[in-house]
């Protein structure tokens, strides 16, 4: 029996080629475009809006001679992704809307719409792969990095479940980006040379403070510079390498704790319009001169409305040895291999998209997971996702608490 695959046609080259591949493989293919955002508040003028994406998606469906539908999921997107973003930024955290979009929209709300069209599978243009193993009578799905490690997007799917993976297809996971564009060019697809989308998933490139001011009001506060040579006592002296597996909980807490800056740790050098508009590692948006090197955000206090900065990329305030994830925020894709309380395991971890995998040791405790890296990590930001891998396989992830 021919299986039906509903492809999320986004108007980009990746989903276009994904649809063609599935058709070549014998699937009954339908294209489904989802409209998730109408508001242009904060959008940069040069960015394309959803009308352009819809036009290109329709052109591809016509060229491939597949049925085409569209669905408006903007209410779901606002409630389940955008509202979460606002809430996290208000707490002084830095969310990743792309990860949430995949978990809550593409492989949930969109999948529901795909099933209404008779779809057995939901296909996307993600650069990642899926396979399955069958220990005993049980089927377990594995999420793997894409063949093109420069474009690997498995990180964005770090929160999907076994149930979501069961009906997911990633047709371009074995291809590189140049190969995808070459196929599109040979097929004469209108999307062949279209630029990749950037910025917030389904919203686009935005001026973040303007976008956030839809819900978060501007509040003037101080920017405090932490000068390394004057405050060395603030920065812990942490050795390189992985800690012993028998390390105490107290030591784990100490080496994963961020620096505790106070106004007395430095001096005021300027003002800002709201601490919740800044994230760890940010260097733009402060408009402060008089320094040899760029200033970077190394901390913030949203309650006191203070932003802490340090000069230069080598400032120790940018680097941390580890992080902590609360137990309720830990997600295992491979539930059969989840760690138990008291267990220690070595994985490769990344804390942002396209970051090279980092050697780390993970410690599962009653309150949550401590992740300690072999080398110091730059820009660990609460609210972001840490994802852990065993080789090419993404095992699980969690929201960074501190």
Question: Residues of each region from the PLM?
Answer:
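AMP-forming adenylation/ATP pyrophosphatase catalytic core
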Residues: 123-128, 134-402
């Amino acid at each position: 029996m021919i299986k039906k695959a509903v492809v999320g046609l986004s108007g980009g080259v990746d989903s276009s080629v994904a649809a063609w591949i599935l058709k070549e493989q014998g699937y009954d293919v339908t294209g489904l475009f989802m409209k998730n955002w109408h508001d242009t508040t904060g959008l940069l003028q040069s960015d394309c809006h959803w009308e352009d994406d819809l036009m290109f998606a329709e052109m591809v469906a016509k060229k491939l001679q597949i049925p085409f539908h569209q669905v408006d999921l903007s209410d779901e997107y606002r409630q389940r992704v955008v509202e979460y973003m606002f809430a996290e930024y208000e707490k002084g955290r830095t969310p990743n809307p792309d990860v949430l979009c995949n978990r809550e929209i593409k492989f949930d709300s969109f999948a529901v719409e795909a099933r209404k069209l008779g779809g057995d599978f939901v296909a996307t243009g993600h650069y990642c792969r899926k396979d399955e193993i069958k220990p005993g009578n049980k089927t377990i799905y594995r999420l793997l990095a894409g063949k093109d490690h420069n474009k690997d997007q498995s990180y964005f799917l770090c929160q999907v479940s076994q149930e979501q993976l069961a009906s997911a297809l990633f047709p371009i996971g074995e291809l590189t980006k140049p190969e995808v564009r070459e196929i599109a060019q040979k097929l004469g697809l209108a999307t062949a040379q279209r630029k990749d989308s950037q910025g917030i998933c389904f919203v686009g490139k935005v001026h973040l403070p303007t976008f956030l001011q839809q819900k978060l009001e501007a509040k003037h506060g101080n920017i405090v510079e932490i000068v390394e040579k004057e405050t060395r006592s603030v920065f812990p002296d942490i050795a390189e390498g992985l800690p012993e597996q028998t390390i105490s909980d107290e030591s784990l807490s100490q080496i994963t704790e961020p620096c505790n800056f106070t106004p007395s740790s430095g001096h005021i050098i300027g003002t800002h319009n709201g601490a919740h508009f800044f994230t760890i590692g940010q260097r733009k948006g402060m408009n402060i001169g008089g320094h040899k090197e760029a200033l970077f955000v190394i901390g913030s206090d949203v309650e006191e409305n203070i932003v802490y900065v340090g000069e230069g990329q080598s400032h120790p305030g940018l680097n941390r040895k580890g992080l902590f994830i609360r137990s309720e925020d830990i997600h295992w894709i491979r539930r059969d291999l989840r760690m138990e309380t008291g267990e220690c395991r070595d994985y490769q971890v990344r804390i942002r998209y396209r970051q090279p995998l980092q050697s780390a040791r993970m410690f599962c405790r009653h309150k949550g997971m401590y992740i300690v890296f072999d080398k110091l990590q730059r820009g660990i930001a609460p609210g972001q996702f840490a994802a852990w891998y065993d080789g090419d396989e993404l095992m699980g992830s969690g929201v960074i608490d501190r």
